[in-house]
């Protein structure tokens, strides 16, 4: 089986933000995130993810507009719940928009969206995007209250924040976070949601997450960009997709259990 060409097993969303970070570090026109996205598709990416931040620290408006008509898969645009970003998203029309929390001083997204605390605002954003024909995803912590609130907004998709799992430093903590994520997946499914996941996943920690049968899609960026320094961009994408699909397929064999998750 060609792992990087296995649709329907588990989807890989390649995040191109940090290709733009490299470009912007020198104020050049290279490396081109658009070219990176198209090459990622050729290497087996099922979608391209990019985050248009309010401060435009990596992806620029022009990147999103240039990329949208060129993609053969689909665009997953991450953005904050602000009127400016919602209007941009509705104008460009990506297939998916993932609403994320955003603070200017953070290095990367530090936690999930507080749907419970900002319910009315998030619900209104979901309605505006859905009205433009865009599928909405909410990037949330693997918490039952947040999942229930996400379902109540009308969003059809949640992306579970895997950062605490990725940052866990001992076996007990890793196992606890995997259990937390698996229960959140089950809760999301119970509410009729499509469940995705991402944040902090790399080549040696993605396997237990990819093995969880209820997860449809993983969005991974920094690890692939970093690995590409040594392995090459398309090889890095192919390797990640192969690891994910192998983990999922091995988990669906009769004798397999979810790695790291106690029964």
From Swiss-Prot:
For this record, the Gene Ontology CC terms, alphabetical, are:
cytosol
Q: Report the top EC class in one word.
A: transferase
Task: Quote the subcellular location field of this record.
Answer: Cytoplasm
Binding positions for 1-deoxy-D-xylulose 5-phosphate per the UniProt entry: 17-18, 53, 58, 108
Name of the gene: pdxJ
What SUPFAM superfamilies has UniProt attached to this entry? Pyridoxine 5'-phosphate synthase
**Record text on subunit structure and interactions:** Homooctamer; tetramer of dimers.
A GO molecular function assigned to this protein is: pyridoxine 5'-phosphate synthase activity
Q: What is its EC number?
A: 2.6.99.2
Free-text function comment from the UniProt entry: Catalyzes the complicated ring closure reaction between the two acyclic compounds 1-deoxy-D-xylulose-5-phosphate (DXP) and 3-amino-2-oxopropyl phosphate (1-amino-acetone-3-phosphate or AAP) to form pyridoxine 5'-phosphate (PNP) and inorganic phosphate.
| Protein name, UniProt field | Pyridoxine 5'-phosphate synthase
